[in-house]
């Protein structure tokens, strides 16, 4: 199963309102799960695209397996390839280009060590010339920024690692 087929499955899940999908086939086990909490729906925000003219948009998609969000298990040898980092993750709600600041010469929305609430804007994901603000969706402390400014992101790509509040 390749990435295009998985993306098609994710799109079909969204269209049909599915929250979870699992398949076992030909030695492959795949599980997909959508975060459907009310606070995670993002409204598009429009920015003047001239603010982002300093960002490069011709960078390759990163293929670091530590940043993948899909859990794959081969049934033949029962090895699992998934991240085991502690903390929770803020993931991209859509496919687009990641921007960690409102403009190329502006400071980042958040940096490691910052405290965020559910409504804190942590980044922008640009899709089809629309700048979409991404909110944290949880309270906690930013442990790590996993994406670089201008990097393309896929739906579900991990953007930030967060230590959630105990409350």
Swiss-Prot record:
GO BP, one annotated term: fatty acid biosynthetic process
Compositionally biased spans, kind Basic and acidic residues: 64-74
InterPro entries from the UniProt entry: AcCoA_biotinCC, Biotin_BS, Biotin_Carboxyl_Carrier/Decarb, Biotin_lipoyl, Single_hybrid_motif
Residue ranges annotated for the Biotinyl-binding domain, each copy included: 87-163
Pfam families the record matches: Biotin_lipoyl
Residues with PTM N6-biotinyllysine: 129
Location of region: Disordered: 53-91
Subunit structure: Homodimer.
Protein name in UniProt: Biotin carboxyl carrier protein of acetyl-CoA carboxylase
Gene assigned in the entry: accB
């Amino acid at each position: 199963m390749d990435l295009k087929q998985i993306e098609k499955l994710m799109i079909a899940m969204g269209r049909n309102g599915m929250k979870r999908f699992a398949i076992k086939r030909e030695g492959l086990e795949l599980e997909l799960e959508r975060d459907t909490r009310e606070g995670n729906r993002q409204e598009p925000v429009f920015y003047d695209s001239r603010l982002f003219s300093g960002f490069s948009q011709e960078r390759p998609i990163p293929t670091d397996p530590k940043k993948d969000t899909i859990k794959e298990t081969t049934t033949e040898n029962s090895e699992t390839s998934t991240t085991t980092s502690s903390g929770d993750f803020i993931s991209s709600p859509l496919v687009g280009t990641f921007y960690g600041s409102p403009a190329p010469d502006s400071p980042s929305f958040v940096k490691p060590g910052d405290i965020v609430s559910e409504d804190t804007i942590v980044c922008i994901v640009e899709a089809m010339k629309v700048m979409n603000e991404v909110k944290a969706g949880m309270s906690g402390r930013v442990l790590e920024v996993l994406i670089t400014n201008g990097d393309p992101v896929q739906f579900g790509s991990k953007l930030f690692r967060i230590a959630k509040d105990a409350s």
